[in-house]
């Protein structure tokens, strides 16, 4: 599910759905149709979004009151903190149209084959997070720009900036990071479809139990 709605904090104008999310999701659905059955449900401004029933949720600009717990959640341009998110919003940092480069805080599969230092932002949301829940992957001047949580309670990625105020959508890093996110949060149940007798293989369980 892709939900985009909200107003620009500076101008008060309605923010339109981001074409970059729409395009990269459509491209991934087409390119990896044999690997993932990606069916995109876009919820328009003014319509009611769902908080259950999807494998992957994208909320842009307007955040849900409570995080969905039955799928992966991407919060893009976070402006308010969902109740059960472990996040706190400390305001907007505006660079007055000056762009700054981000830095990688750690290695993570989501950043695989990317060069994070190519990414710039000119405005972002200052976020305080619970370090026991989240890992900061990208930052600027100590402020987190991309946070990830992946545990039994929740699977969440938080982009603390809007794609409208970043060069990320114009870089190869954007589709790579979206692909890596799917690989990281929703790995294949099994790799391969033909095995020899006594050959060992791994089954990835996405639920609480796995029966074979």
Where are these regions (language model features)?
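N-linked glycosylation sequons
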Residues: 1-212
